[in-house]
């Protein structure tokens, strides 16, 4: 049973009895005999006939192969039935006995089919190669004929020249090439191939007759023409071609042109050295352009770049004048015939002080305005930083006059050139945020940032219970401030340089500020206060803020300053109108406190986020309520700035140079302590807080206040 199934073919089974094995073998032999002459057919027939014949042979073999597969499948069925025990008739038993012969014929037919398919592929390749070869030969013959036609036309045209005719009759080395009769035959044939225009015939018909004459000449036919035959004319033309007469003969007109060109060549060469520019001029011009254009595009500021091109050239090519002059003198020494270089632009020598000032100005511009320094770049050393306490003292008169260049107002920008030894700072970058407002509105003025080279450490010896909030401007500060060219008279604060400032946005470590003294300090302690005292003093705050500044754009001299009273608020503390507080900045931190404020249970954070460097409780107090330091733009009479919890604080409220909108000042259950004052000068007209009696601030510890005389 397994042997019967193993020999089963893939062909379909037929219902009728299988044909005898002898007939199948004869059919295969006939197919092989028919293929034998077909294999010799490609050598005698065309490509198309060979391809068609091969397709027919492959079709016959494929048909016989399908019949053998059907027969083999039928025999497999008979053998399977016999193995199951079924009884078969005699014809079926005879067919089963021929099973091996049918299998052999099937294998032979398959092998024959593979052979003919390979032969067919070879024939196809041969046909393609032959067709390609014939195409190339045909193109080559056509190209050769076309070349011969062009040569014949050229020879016939040149025979009209008397000199050419004489040369052909005399020949080369005394051997004549053509005789007079042959020249006459060529003249007659020329009239046939290049006839004159006959208006009685169409142009197409006239040149059709001429092409027939040329074709017969190229073929060398024996047809008579001009008293001779095309074959004789072809021999005459070939003799002229083989003489190579026209290869060595030059046209006289072309020769004259060549002689004229050769004669004009030396004249051009003589003019070239005269028109050569001097290398010295080109070199100096390139050096000047490269140095000027590179520096102006890379390092010049935008305002100075558009001010004037002549000023930029004088500014940045001053240092390279000596090099350009040396390069100029070398070509002059080598070629004394040139009196002066025309491409060198003379540059005037600038003042050394002005030049040094411009270099320092460039250094400051490359450093960049410190208003754009991010908060993440600032380094904080104090962990209890809190801008809530204002501590101010007048600066020394000697320190106020150290760097007068930095206190010039922006309207006098040309005064930067007055002090060449100082590093100037851009006007928009020297503004320290200060608040200078009145009871009726907000008035912005240009503050003065007065640096100091010496670091002054203030002692902490006074008792802690004396918190003073009055800025006393003494006579020394009045004398120093009146001598400075300023647009307005602001408050001047001083602190140690080791305490960097956070909310001012100034990087004191930058190059323009390394020689200055930082004027802020965040180390003033504040003791806590009791809540009842705070509730008693909430409604006793001053109704107006008496600090005022002059906004004159010109320099004024003030011999005496009024002593202004700065009244500050910590948490819900409000001073009465008759209270006068003075902050001396000499406080002593109590031993029972590690920081200025204890950690509160519910600190308030505004939408800006916490500042870096402080504890969590202290950071919540930095911007926990609305005031001029955290973006409030309303009337100043209802709010007071906050105190700082760090010792020796010299920080005051920020100026509204860029107003900020903090929308989260009423979040996390925070309720403002009081309504806005009557004087509304900010962009918001209606208060956002609730009315009614004020409540103590939930996110801040209370401070004890003490009135001093």
Swiss-Prot record:
Ability to mediate liquid-liquid phase separation is regulated by ATP: moderate concentrations of ATP enhance phase separation, whereas high concentrations of ATP lead to inhibition of phase separation. It is found in: Cytoplasm, Cytoplasmic ribonucleoprotein granule; Cytoplasm, Cytosol; Cell projection, Dendrite; Cell projection, Lamellipodium. Ubiquitous. The modification Phosphoserine is found at residues 10, 115, 335, 343. One of its GO terms (biological process) is generation of neurons. Residues 433-446, 577-605, 642-657 have a biased composition (Polar residues). It comes from the Eukaryota. Changing residue 633 to K: Abolished ability to undergo liquid-liquid phase separation for the formation of a membraneless compartment. Residues 1-15, 22-43, 477-491, 537-570, 676-686, 697-709 have a biased composition (Low complexity). Changing residue 373 to F: Increased interaction with G3BP1. Keywords: Acetylation, ATP-binding, Autism, Autism spectrum disorder, Cell projection, Coiled coil, Cytoplasm, Differentiation, Disease variant, Glycoprotein, Intellectual disability, Methylation, Neurodegeneration, Nucleotide-binding, Phosphoprotein, Protein synthesis inhibitor, RNA-binding. The modification Omega-N-methylarginine is found at residues 165, 626, 633, 640, 698. Residues 271-291 have a biased composition (Acidic residues). Changing residue 612 to A: Major reduction in MYC and CCND2 RNA-binding. Belongs to the caprin family. PANTHER family: CAPRIN-1, GPI-ANCHORED PROTEIN P137. This is Caprin-1.
């Amino acid at each position: 049973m397994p042997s019967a199934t193993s020999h089963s073919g893939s062909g379909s089974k037929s219902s009728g009895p299988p044909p005898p094995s002898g007939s199948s073998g004869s059919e295969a032999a006939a197919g092989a005999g028919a293929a034998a002459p077909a294999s010799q057919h490609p050598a005698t027939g065309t490509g198309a006939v060979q391809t068609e014949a091969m397709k027919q042979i492959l079709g016959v073999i494929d048909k016989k192969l399908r019949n053998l597969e059907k027969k083999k499948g039928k025999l497999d069925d008979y053998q399977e039935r016999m193995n199951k025990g079924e009884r078969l008739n005699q014809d079926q038993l005879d067919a089963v006995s021929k099973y091996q012969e049918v299998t052999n014929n099937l294998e032979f037919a398959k092998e024959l089919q593979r052979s003919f398919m390979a032969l067919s592929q070879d024939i196809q390749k041969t046909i393609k190669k032959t067709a390609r070869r014939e195409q190339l030969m045909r193109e080559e013959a056509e190209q050769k004929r076309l070349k011969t036609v062009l040569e014949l036309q050229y020879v016939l045209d040149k025979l009209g020249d008397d000199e050419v005719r004489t040369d052909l009759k005399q020949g080369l080395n005394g051997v004549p090439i053509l005789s007079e009769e042959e020249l006459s035959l060529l003249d007659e044939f020329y009239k046939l191939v290049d006839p004159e225009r006959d208006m009685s015939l169409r142009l197409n018909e006239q040149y059709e007759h001429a092409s027939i004459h040329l074709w017969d000449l190229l073929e060398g036919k024996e047809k008579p023409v001009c008293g001779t035959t095309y074959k004789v004319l072809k021999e005459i033309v070939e003799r002229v071609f083989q003489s190579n007469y026209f290869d060595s003969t030059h046209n006289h007109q072309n020769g004259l042109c060549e002689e004229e060109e050769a004669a004009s060549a030396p004249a051009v060469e003589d003019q070239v050295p005269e028109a050569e520019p001097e290398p010295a001029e080109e070199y100096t011009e390139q050096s000047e352009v490269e140095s000027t254009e590179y520096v102006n595009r890379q390092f010049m500021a935008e305002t100075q770049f558009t001010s004037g091109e002549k000023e930029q050239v004088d500014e940045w090519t001053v240092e390279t004048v000596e090099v350009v002059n040396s390069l100029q003198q070398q070509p002059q020494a080598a070629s004394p015939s040139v009196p002066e270089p025309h491409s060198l632009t003379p540059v005037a020598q600038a003042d050394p002080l002005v030049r040094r000032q411009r270099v320092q100005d460039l250094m400051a511009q490359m450093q960049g305005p410190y208003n754009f320094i991010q908060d993440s770049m600032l380094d904080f050393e104090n962990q209890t930083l809190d801008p809530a306490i204002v501590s101010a003292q007048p600066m020394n008169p000697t320190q106020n006059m150290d760097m007068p260049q930095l206190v010039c107002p922006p309207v006098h920008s040309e005064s930067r050139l007055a002090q060449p030894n100082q590093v100037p700072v851009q006007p928009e970058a020297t503004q320290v945020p200060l608040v200078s407002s009145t009871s009726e509105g907000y008035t912005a003025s240009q503050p003065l940032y007065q640096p100091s080279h010496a670091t002054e450490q203030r002692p902490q010896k006074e008792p802690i219970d004396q918190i003073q909030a009055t800025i006393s401007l003494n006579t020394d500060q009045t004398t120093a401030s009146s001598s400075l060219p300023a647009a307005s008279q602001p408050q001047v604060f001083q602190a140690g340089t080791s305490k960097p400032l956070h909310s001012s946005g100034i990087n004191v470590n930058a190059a323009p500020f390394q020689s200055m003294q930082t004027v802020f300090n965040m180390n003033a302690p504040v003791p806590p206060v009791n809540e009842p005292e705070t509730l008693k003093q909430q409604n006793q705050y001053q109704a107006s803020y008496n600090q005022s500044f002059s906004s004159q754009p010109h320099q004024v001299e003030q011999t005496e300053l009024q002593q202004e009273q700065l009244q500050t608020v910590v948490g819900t503390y409000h001073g009465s109108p008759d209270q006068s507080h003075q902050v001396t900045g000499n406080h002593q931190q109590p031993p029972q406190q590690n920081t200025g404020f204890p950690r509160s249970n519910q600190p308030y954070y505004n939408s800006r986020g916490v500042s870096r460097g402080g504890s969590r409780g202290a950071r919540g107090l930095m911007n926990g309520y609305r005031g001029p330091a955290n973006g409030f733009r309303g009337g100043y009479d209802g709010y007071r700035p906050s105190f700082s919890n760090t010792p020796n604080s010299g920080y005051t409220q920020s100026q509204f140079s860029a107003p900020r909108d903090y929308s989260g000042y009423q979040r996390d259950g925070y309720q403002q302590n009081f309504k806005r004052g009557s004087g509304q000068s900010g962009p918001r007209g209606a208060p956002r807080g609730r009315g009614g009696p004020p409540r103590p601030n939930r996110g801040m510890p209370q401070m004890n206040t003490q009135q001093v005389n």
